[in-house]
Amino acid sequence: MNQHTPAAALACAGLLGYCRAGFEKELAAELDDIAAEAGLIGYVRAEPDSGYVIYETFEPTPLGSFGESTDWRRPVFARQLLPWFARVDDLPERDRATPIVEAVKASGQRFSGVMLETPDTDEAKQRSGFCKRFTEPLAKALEKAGCLRSSRAGLPVLHVLFTSATTAWLAAGQPGQCSTWPMGIPRVRMPSNAPSRSTAKLSEAFMMLLEEGERDSILRAGQRAVDLGAAPGGWTWQLVNRGLRVTAIDNGPLRDSVMATEMVEHLKADGFTWRPHRPVDWMVCDMVEQPSRIASLMAEWVATGRCRYTIFNLKLPMKRRVEAVEQCRELIRKRLASVGPYDLRIKHLYHDREEVTAFLTLKR
């Protein structure tokens, strides 16, 4: 390879998004909107329960033309979002590396590293062992061909998504635009002494919804927090574990392990009507209720200054997931319109099922 394409000029064929199996329709709708905003012309392909969605442009499009449309943080239902540039079919069982290397060479693009992935489905996970074994041989073959320069900062990462044993999609993960976790799934450790599995959801929310620098600056030991709908204490435990003092609001009981920390005040009250005597740093909420009611309550807390930051969960109706999310966005927008600019981030987490998790704060 004597000539190499600048990353912005890499000819791409569309967008590749990873999602939870069963949420392809929702991600497809989001990719349609994102592509339209970016001025891309093409179509979506989404197979039910496949765990991924393809947006394919009618003409090759320079990577630079995608702009911020490839930012994985934008679509709610995407775990990962990448511009893809090639699909390699009919991979021979004894030599999968050569066709992939040839496709990468044909693109003219160098990469800083390579990540082999599968969709998050039971069928695809059977190839995860192969991906681990094949990563090093493929990396060596790419390096030998001049396609890999691990010492070059700023180059994209080559993502190879095996949707079957014989088909691989090749995509370019740009620094700062794509998720750095394999398959877009952060590895969250489930502590053995946590009162419920929901603690892992809040831990993932901190990882997914807050930037690394933010986690250190706005989530600190010694802060005060409120947990609405706290029982049995999974989210409260996560906050306490990070050094926050928590007022837990729930008519139900909290686990003894939560109360034993001596950093929790448990008040038996209704999460919708209770208010703190003075502002707190954080409010979190995982109450089972209509998403519109939760969104309105969260916006009210932020608008009135009762909390600076909030992370909350929205339970979605099965057949109108996208519409429910947009309704909540609009409710929050209307309530905060007269207050000032705000930052709302919503993601369908790995630990979410028929729900999404959101972060909200006023911009300061």
Swiss-Prot record:
Mind naming one GO cellular-component term on file for this protein?
cytoplasm
Q: Is DNA-binding among this UniProt entry's keywords?
A: no
What are the UniProt keywords, alphabetically?
Answer: Cytoplasm, Methyltransferase, rRNA processing, S-adenosyl-L-methionine, Transferase
Q: What class of enzyme is it?
A: transferase
**A GO molecular-function annotation:** S-adenosylmethionine-dependent methyltransferase activity
Name the principal localization, coarsely classed: cytoplasm
One Pfam family from the record: FtsJ
- GO biological process assignments: methylation; rRNA processing
Catalytic activity reads: cytidine(2498) in 23S rRNA + S-adenosyl-L-methionine = 2'-O-methylcytidine(2498) in 23S rRNA + S-adenosyl-L-homocysteine + H(+)
Protein family: Belongs to the class I-like SAM-binding methyltransferase superfamily. RNA methyltransferase RlmE family. RlmM subfamily.
Q: What does this protein do?
A: Catalyzes the 2'-O-methylation at nucleotide C2498 in 23S rRNA.
Q: How does it assemble?
A: Monomer.
Alphabetized HAMAP family for the sequence: 23SrRNA_methyltr_M (MF_01551)
* Name of protein: Ribosomal RNA large subunit methyltransferase M
